[in-house]
From Swiss-Prot:
PANTHER family: FI09636P-RELATED, URIDINE PHOSPHORYLASE. Keywords: Glycosyltransferase, Transferase. GO terms for cellular component: cytosol. Its EC number is 2.4.2.1. A purine D-ribonucleoside binds at H4, E179, M180, E181, S203, D204. Pfam families: PNP_UDP_1. This is Purine nucleoside phosphorylase DeoD-type. The record marks R217 as: Important for catalytic activity. Homohexamer; trimer of homodimers.
Length: 235
């Protein structure tokens, strides 16, 4: 057991999906995994392990933001030996050619979080995805004719931002979308020499105000999960 995860050794698979919402973790386990069993409910942050196409896979809720995902990613890698971590979540687009319901695969993750600045003595570390996972996820998405974009995203510490000036600036530098966790996940995966990837569904467009309905989000979410699980089969 670790501080925030109540699993015993061996209960968590080497490959894990990481939604922010613990109820999404439960949904993934019940919908996509065979023989799924709950290994964690500490603080209500549910975790499950089952099989997908014969491969053992876990899914663990992480909560929202850099501090929360950092806790779970650290403990999963340090205490349970997890090797492959795939974040599955939502994001807000900031490019004109990206529409709601599109899928974004994060090649890298810029951030305003001070976590890496403190860690690297004020230099700008560039958190980057594992190429093998990224390449496989892109192949799977394109084979299924899903609208997918690959590029840099921005991990924000602020959900309710008063001004969009920063996001407009980031858009001019080809940043695709905004979310709140990936830079921390990629940094920790680099630290532990593990493999990480973020696959995100566009739930809204920050600059145009376009949004998806709950039903639309669920449909696209299912497609994204299948991409993540099939990409995970290579590891």
């Amino acid at each position: 057991m670790s501080i925030h995860i109540g699993a015993q050794q061996g209960q968590i698979a080497e490959t894990i999906l990481l939604p922010g919402d613990p109820l999404r973790a439960k949904y993934i386990a019940e919908t996509f995994l065979e023989g799924a069993e709950c290994y964690n409910n500490v603080r209500g942050m549910l975790g499950f392990t089952g099989t997908y196409k014969g491969k053992r896979v876990s899914v663990q809720g992480t909560g929202m933001g850099v501090p929360s995902i950092s806790i779970y990613a650290n403990e999963l890698m340090q205490s349970y030996g997890v090797q492959n971590l795939i974040r599955v979540g939502t994001c807000g687009a900031i490019q004109e050619d990206i529409k709601v319901r599109d899928v974004i695969i994060a090649m890298s993750a810029s951030s305003e979080s001070q976590t890496n600045r403190l860690l690297f003595d004020q230099i700008d570390f560039a958190p980057t995805a594992n190429f093998e996972l990224l390449h496989k996820a892109y192949q799977v998405a394109t084979e299924r004719n899903l609208p997918v974009k690959v590029g840099n995203i921005f991990t924000s510490d602020s959900f309710y931002r008063e001004s969009l000036d920063l996001y407009k600036k980031l858009a001019s530098y080809q940043v695709l979308a905004i979310e709140m966790e990936s830079s921390a996940l990629y940094t920790l995966a680099a630290k532990y020499k593990r493999n990480a990837l973020s696959i995100l569904t566009v739930s809204d467009h920050i600059l145009t105000g376009e949004e998806t309905s709950a039903d639309e989000r669920q449909s696209t979410f299912n497609e994204m999960i299948e991409v993540a699980l099939d990409a995970a089969l290579i590891k």
